[in-house]
Amino acid sequence: MKKVIGIISLLLSVTLATANPVDFDKAFKESAKIEKQIKKTSFPDRTYLITDFGAKPDTPDEPCHEAINQAIVTCSLNGGGTVVVPKGTFYTGPITLKSNVNFHVEEGAVLKFSTDQSLYFPGVITRWEGLDCYNARPLIYAYGETNIAITGKGTIDGQGSKEAWWPMCGSPRYGWKEGMVAQRNGGRERLLMYGETSTPIYKRIMKPEDGMRPQLINLYSCNTILIEDVTLLNSPFWVIHPLFCESLIVRGVHVFNRGPNGDGCDPESCKNVLIENCTFDTGDDCIAIKSGRNQDGRKWNIPSENIIVRNCFMKNGHGGVVIGSEISGGYRNLFVENCRMDSPNLDRVIRIKTSTCRGGLIENVFVRNVAVGQCREAVLRINLQYENREKCNRGYAPTVRNVHLKNVTCEKSKLGVLIIGLDDDKHVYNVSVEDSRFNNVEKGGNQIKGAKDITFKNLYINGELVK
């Protein structure tokens, strides 16, 4: 037994005690109030076919983004409506969304984005791994728009592969060979330096030779957004990246992206977000909530807040639902429920990752009714020492508090709960797991250090009650 208790008792700064029970019903009533605050998109009953503007299917050497963008601009200027991609395979370059436009990809339609990097420059203002810059134009982009949507049962294919985009990560695993353009050849390091030295954003201009891959969808400072039903494949980089957005719904979306840094949905400094009924099969985190990296996050000081995740299936990825690591602006109020996760390649179920480079306050995380077949490492991992080798200005101790799990089951993992705090126990506290069962836990239990007020109530690991 008492292997579990033995592991815990040998670790520092841990308190296992009977605490006041967490009122999950009350917490999720708050999430219902948040959901009511999310503004819904609405579009006039007007339709614009991209083929009426000159777009032709099956022309890989003649991408039709100019026709698509003309249809979008016309629709917006006329008061809004729906721009339709009809059945067929259309090859395109970068697309820019405009206010009051529903970009609708019909069932049977496939939108394939060109891998000609020159089409995506000059760049636009965005963030790359939490750092402000001008980088390659995202494949679908919007800046400062209101009431926009990407809908339909069609497919949007970024065409990332070992032959295009993915080798730029610099890893032979993804097709990189000596002499190829790659982010590790100085571009990423220079951008990190820009952030640490507070270089003005207008001077942070990334070029094609820097190898900084674009996102599939990047919505910058937009509000009232719907992404629904589409299938998103093979992004060069992160798949869905809302940045400084408010009132966002991601519903019924299927994400398949096994590429490097292939995060599924990364709301960054966003407020009032609903992600539901989605499937994620990714090469990195399925959902990763962010709020800026280091000085850039602290400068804006805009937390992500009020995010609801429910009825999703996380099939593959580094983490199911993740906060961080670019989380310097902080995070509050996450509600996760009724999700399924199952893969030997899924590393962690719930993950919080940050460091003394980042700082920030992360609080109020509520997770219930999550069923996990298996994960590679831990059901819950909180790590305040993420990427300790990172070159940065340190001294910004983060705080993680009020993290609560209930009715979470996992059939196989290495650990139950893994918490890596700082040298004291002041920066991770008030964490609880209740009414949960973790079976076939290889290392026998939990590993916790640098934390306090950790409560386990009716938590069974390998059939034994953790006391």
Regions found by a protein language model. Give the residues of each.
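Extracellular "leader-to-stem" segments immediately downstream of a signal peptide or signal-anchor
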Residues: 2-12, 16-84, 89-102, 106-221, ...
